[in-house]
Each structure stands twice: as structure tokens, then as C-alpha cells.
Amino acid sequence: MRRDLDALAADMAFDYLGKFGAWQFYTQFTPEGVRELEDLGYGAVWLGGSPPADWDGYEKLLAGSESIVVATSIVNVWGTTAEAAADTYLRLEEKFPGRFLLGIGVGHPEHTG
């Protein structure tokens, strides 16, 4: 049974994220910085600090690069609506197919306003 689970996990690998990624607070990323990371071979940037689902910076980071994945780490369910998260994901997926990874989690409800 364990071997089957290991094989399944290997099949579900996220190769499109690349071997290396960069994580920092979401407002610290710039389109120029993301492009530089992409040029250095990074496969993904992870936007920490619970960015809002409707943050306008996602599109700027994606538009300023060609292939790197922009991933949220995480959008906090206590600070956004399901509709806002879905709208953002669908809009960015249409414009930048396969390059926006929406990470959603419960985070810390006491840190939301």
C-alpha cells in the first residue's frame, strides 16, 4: 500500500514549479525582480503575508515575466470571499494560463481586520 502512495505522489509532482522558488512578503516583489528571478532559472515566486485575493499586483508580476509561476502563500479565507478568490483565479488563468497558483488556507483569523 505504501508503495502505491509513493507512486501516486511521484505522479502528482509539480514539475512546472521548477526546482527553485523564491518566497517573500507579497508587497516586496516587483515585476523587474520577478523577471530577474525568472532569468536566473527560478520556476516560481511565492507571495507570503496573506495577500488579498483581489490584489492588483498579481497581474503586474505575471505581465512582467514570461513563464514563472506566481503563487499565493496563502490567501487567508478569513480575509476574503470565495467569489473574490474565484474571480481573480479565473481572470488570471484566462490571461496567463497555468502561471497563477492560488494557495488558500485558514491562516490566523486574529490577524485579519
Indicate residue ranges for each PLM-predicted region.
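N-terminal beta1-alpha1-beta2 module of alpha/beta enzyme domains
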Residues: 1-72, 78
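Flexible, glycine-rich active-site loops centered on histidine and acidic residues
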Residues: 2, 15-23, 82-113
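Short beta-strands and strand-loop turn motifs
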Residues: 70-73, 103-105
